[in-house]
């Protein structure tokens, strides 16, 4: 076989030289991206060029046959194509690295450093965001003696249609953090359980609170009022500083997050530094991409209304209507207001502006709500204050980064049907507080990194149980044309109606009072088996066996992907992970 020969070497060398200059003389990026990929590419080109020259020299000695013009053109084409492909790969690799790093700025970046002011306050912890998670965390770490700097985009009272129901398990965490008085003086309502409605029937599900103090129950309220109370609580500590501003990026040095860059409402740029930066900027976080691998799913949208001056059929209970095509949720948020959330599957909504949404609510949804609140529902629709909120689900998939971690909805989300978000956030804060307590000096980078790694494992049993239940229950409650899914939905309602352990067990999981992953899986498949057993009565048939197999398959297809995303080992076997064993430094 003849060696590969490049006859028109000068032109090929010119092409390689121009690509090499392009690679080595690109302007430096303001992001903290290493140029190792470009350097490696340039080295590879030089070696390839040397090999080509050597091949040419050898072939010139051993061959006297001149290539035809078509062969020369082919060599030129191959050389150009190779150069183009190499540059494309390098460029794409660079862009991918930028995307994955998110808004992280290197401390070596000097382009705009002279236009910024450094905040030198001896801060121990920077918290980005002062919502439920950020405010509670600021107060908690402040009580531990940490010097905390909180940066929040807007301190005005927020008006949200979610984050209004705190489960009893979350209230217990609130007590553990010393924040239980934050649900007082905001007209919060006690919640003692749920009532499920389906096809004219209903079943009452009470929280298993017999072993707890009389004050322990769920709480429902205006989210904004609750958050404002926690912010006020944090401000009572002299070592906690709240500042209004927008964090634009994290500051990185040698792979460690050193602080944040932020802009005040006046437009001034500042940099603040601390050994630990905790990002709690909510479900719309623009910083999470540098600290985790976000896989956000939006299965549906909540359409929110406020029903005024009406009473629910069962006082102090959340009401869930298993409607068509999806659930309708109602609960009190004050002594005179009821929040109604209508779930609309998918991401395509009837437009609000042209009245299509109002028509949908009055003709499709109103006939399914309980009779006692139907008139108030229609009145709220006609009033026109209709709001929407996409329902997001995102399993926690962190990128362990020295000096920083994520918390709250910025880190982990689940379908809000079960109201478990605040419970997960508060439980995470308790875990983090206990982990950081032995570390007297947060500047101990090695110890801090190990404890942050432990946090991601220790939070899993509680968080993954609530996450899995929320996402799985939503899929079960959805109306479906599939016969197996329909049977599963019917069986779930009837299973919970049996009472005793069949209702108290699932409700204890939902409320955060007994967040055990194994208990969740057992109850979930107990519902599926209950559905199959009903099909076999009074006499089994081939059709019932086939449908039963489809029910088991459907149940497995619902829960196993969720468990896989949460992490099987961390969820069920956390003690096998070395990261949870950390001795005090």
From Swiss-Prot:
It is an enzyme of class 1 (oxidoreductase). SUPFAM superfamilies: FAD/NAD(P)-binding domain. The keyword Flavoprotein applies. GO terms for molecular function: flavin adenine dinucleotide binding; squalene monooxygenase activity. It is found in: Mitochondrion membrane. It catalyses: squalene + reduced [NADPH--hemoprotein reductase] + O2 = (S)-2,3-epoxysqualene + oxidized [NADPH--hemoprotein reductase] + H2O + H(+). The chain crosses the membrane at residues 70-90, 493-513, 520-540, 545-565. Its EC number is 1.14.14.17. InterPro entries: FAD/NAD-bd_sf (IPR036188), Squalene_epoxidase (IPR013698), Squalene_monox (IPR040125). FAD binds at residues 132-133, 152-153, 160, 231, 247, 409, 422. It is a multi-pass membrane protein. Catalyzes the stereospecific oxidation of squalene to (S)-2,3-epoxysqualene, and is considered to be a rate-limiting enzyme in steroid biosynthesis. Produces primarily oxidosqualene. This is Squalene epoxidase 2, mitochondrial.
